[in-house]
């Protein structure tokens, strides 16, 4: 068996206590980040389930008239400003509707953003305003970055990720000597303290690469603005614009406020056909433009096959003549220009298809367990007579708050799925009501859990509640949309079917787990 050299006692104690303190401080927020992020991975796959209007026959993106989409949007939005940045997302099997993001003039000096959904078969435009009609998966995604907290939320998520990286390294150094022994000695039998300790070390070692990816990319995304200045100072003589241009080629394109309008120039259809012909193996995922209709306007086409880590590209064409201004060719990009896209792919698991997302999801759930086992190790180690009753009660309260916050996320996520079906799709301000049901439901579940002093009872209750709610998800979808689980399978609506089936499977599994495995263990709190 491999023998690893241990740290010196003093250094080991420093690393151990640093790992413990940093882990306890960030565990509340970090669990939310990973749990919400695990579901946010499937935003595209959830789209048809949460939006019944998107359950239509998929139209080949190459057969869509994108210039006609622009004209149809202009009819619905007469004040649409084409000189501002606007874009179109072509239809896919996951998202059969075409997205349109644009701006319209409020007055001479003010514009407001809007979102529209276009049926690529009929070119019917459904206006969603500033917020899309369905927001369920995006709410979960925003929770991953704490976007619900104004201004500082994204920075908070970045700081948590940074300290997570710190906790990873201190934990690795702390358990370095015992990693091999604990890994091979792992068992689900024996005392809970030993199970928690062995699994914390073993699973932490197995998921180490995954955790490093998320700690690094999460910190970079959350603290990107704070990292911009030192990067500009060290590598670009203080010029922040040069940093942005090195990473994002489109930022290097300059536009004039005095540009004149021109007619009959390069169009969206022209750009789509040109890129498709030159890159047939790379689907077009987004088309956007700046100063469209003006002599210095541009049209940018982004491609990505969703399989390779560097299999994305970007092509910028001049609106006036269709000449290529910039070309970021897939698999052939420079290091600086591909760095940001690689980080994005690593974080969102968009480089290996659905199977990779499932692996990411499982690893995220394992990471959530690692955090919980760490908290239980911390609490068990302090439930001794060497600590005063006051200290032990404090440790118990911290543990109970952690378990109530984290374990209640299971039924809370089921609640937002149910709310997405219960709240009428055409109700004005629908997003507000769905989100309110989710967060208020989560808050009620959390507060309820604080009254359960027994940890195993708390976990058991949340699993039962969450499992029952999961079983209601396919029922709600069938009742409110008419697309029952068996009908979606027959109609080959596989994305809708997979969500209902997964919810049903989780619900049944949770109830079986509760019946045959989970037992309420009497744990002394002081």
Specify the residue positions occupied by each region the protein language model found:
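Extended, hydrophilic extramembrane loops/domains of integral membrane proteins
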Residues: 104-145, 169, 306-345, 368-376
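Alpha-helical transmembrane segments forming the membrane-embedded cores
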Residues: 215-261, 389-522
């Amino acid at each position: 068996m491999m023998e690893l050299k241990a740290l010196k006692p003093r250094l080991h104690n420093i690393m151990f206590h640093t790992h413990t303190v940093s882990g306890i401080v960030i565990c509340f927020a970090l669990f939310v980040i990973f749990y919400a992020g695990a579901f946010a991975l499937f935003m595209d796959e959830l789209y048809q389930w949460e939006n019944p209007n998107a359950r239509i026959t998929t139209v080949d993106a190459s057969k869509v008239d994108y210039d006609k989409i622009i004209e149809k949007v202009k009819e619905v939005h007469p004040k649409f400003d084409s000189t501002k940045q606007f874009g179109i997302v072509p239809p896919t099997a996951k998202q059969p509707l075409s997205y349109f993001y644009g701006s319209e003039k409020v007055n001479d000096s003010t514009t407001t953003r809007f979102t529209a959904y276009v049926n690529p078969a009929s070119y019917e435009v459904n206006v969603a305003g500033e917020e899309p009609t369905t927001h369920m998966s995006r709410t979960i995604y925003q929770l991953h970055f704490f976007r619900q907290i104004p201004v500082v939320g994204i920075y908070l998520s970045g700081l948590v990720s940074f300290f997570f990286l710190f906790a990873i390294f201190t934990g690795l150094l702390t358990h370095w000597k015992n990693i091999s022994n604990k890994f091979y000695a792992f068992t689900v039998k024996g005392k809970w303290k030993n199970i928690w300790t062995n699994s914390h070390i073993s699973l932490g070692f197995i998921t180490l690469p995954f955790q490093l990816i998320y700690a690094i990319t999460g910190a970079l995304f959350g603290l990107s603005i704070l990292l911009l200045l030192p990067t500009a100072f060290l590598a670009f003589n203080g010029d922040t614009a040069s940093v942005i241009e090195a990473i994002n080629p489109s930022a290097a394109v300059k536009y004039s406020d005095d540009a004149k309008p021109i007619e009959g120039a390069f169009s969206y259809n022209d750009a789509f056909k040109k890129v498709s012909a030159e890159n047939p193996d790379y689907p077009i995922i987004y088309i956007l433009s700046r100063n469209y209709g003006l002599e210095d306007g541009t049209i940018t086409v982004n491609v990505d096959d969703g399989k390779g880590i560097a299999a994305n590209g970007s092509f910028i064409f001049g609106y006036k003549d269709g000449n290529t201004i910039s070309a970021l060719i897939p698999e052939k990009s420079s290091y600086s220009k591909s760095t940001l896209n690689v980080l994005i792919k690593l974080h969102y698991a968009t480089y290996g298809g659905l199977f990779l997302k499932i692996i990411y999801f499982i690893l995220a759930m394992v990471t959530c367990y690692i955090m919980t086992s760490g908290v239980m190790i911390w609490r068990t180690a302090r439930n001794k007579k060497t600590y005063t009753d006051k200290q032990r009660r404090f440790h118990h309260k911290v543990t109970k708050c952690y378990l109530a916050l984290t374990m209640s996320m299971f039924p809370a996520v089921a609640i937002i799925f149910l709310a997405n079906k219960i709240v009428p799709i055409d109700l004005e301000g629908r997003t507000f009501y769905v989100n309110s049901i989710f967060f208020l439901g989560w808050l009620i579940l959390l507060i309820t859990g604080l009254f359960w002093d027994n940890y195993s009872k708390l976990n058991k209750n949340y699993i039962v509640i969450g499992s029952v709610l999961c079983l209601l998800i396919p029922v709600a979808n069938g009742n409110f949309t008419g697309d029952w689980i068996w009908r979606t399978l027959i109609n080959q609506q596989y994305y809708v079917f997979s969500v209902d089936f997964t919810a049903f499977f989780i619900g049944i599994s949770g109830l079986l787990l509760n019946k045959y495995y989970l037992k309420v263990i009497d744990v002394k709190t002081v």
